[in-house]
UniProtKB/Swiss-Prot annotation:
Its EC number is 1.5.1.3. Residues 2-156 form the DHFR domain. Belongs to the dihydrofolate reductase family. GO terms for biological process: dihydrofolate metabolic process; folic acid metabolic process; one-carbon metabolic process; response to antibiotic; response to methotrexate; tetrahydrofolate biosynthetic process. The gene is dhfrI. SUPFAM superfamilies: Dihydrofolate reductase-like. Homodimer. One of its GO terms (molecular function) is dihydrofolate reductase activity. Pathway: Cofactor biosynthesis; tetrahydrofolate biosynthesis; 5,6,7,8-tetrahydrofolate from 7,8-dihydrofolate: step 1/1. It comes from the Bacteria. Key enzyme in folate metabolism. Catalyzes an essential reaction for de novo glycine and purine synthesis, and for DNA precursor synthesis. It comes from Escherichia coli. This is Dihydrofolate reductase type 1. Pfam families: DHFR_1.
Length: 157
């Protein structure tokens, strides 16, 4: 099973402030929606609760709480290991989509990074881990917006 990771990061490494993303760069969310369309997303409970279930996506939500969902496109797992074991049986590609603890736990296991770097330095309390040295950028596109940002694809190897 291929694991990808998608994240929006500020210039100072912030990815969140509590349950919120501390910016709104017009157009950047469209990248997320396009890349994750019809895909399985692996997320933590807090991230899932803050983003909600977007249409045309399936979710593997990792939580230690008693969180439940009636949505047929949401599976709930007590650990990342359980989620990955079960996802391998039903899909060949998963996009790791946050939050901070999920990224930290899986960044060394993913094959591809989809990173939007937002040209802002907000306050926040959730940070993205350091990109491992065995990843290399293979694509970059800059976007002018209300807050400028660049989108990069990084590959392992």
């Amino acid at each position: 099973m291929k694991l990808s990771l998608m994240v929006a990061i500020s210039k100072n490494g912030v990815i969140g402030n509590g349950p919120d993303i501390p910016w709104s760069a017009k157009g950047e969310q469209l990248l997320f929606k396009a890349i994750t369309y019809n895909q399985w997303l692996l997320v933590g409970r807090k991230t899932f609760e803050s983003m909600g279930a977007l249409p045309n996506r399936k979710y593997a939500v990792v939580t230690r709480s008693s969180f439940t969902s009636d949505n047929e496109n949401v599976l709930i797992f007590p650990s990342i290991k359980d989620a990955l074991t079960n996802l391998k049986k039903i899909t060949d590609h998963v996009i790791v989509s946050g939050g901070g603890e999920i990224y930290k736990s899986l960044i060394d296991q993913v094959d591809t990074l989809h990173i939007s770097t937002i040209d802002i330095e907000p306050e926040g309390d959730v940070y993205f881990p350091e990109i491992p040295s065995n990843f290399r950028p293979v694509f970059t596109q800059d976007f002018a917006s209300n807050i400028n940002y660049s989108y990069q694809i990084w590959q392992k190897g």
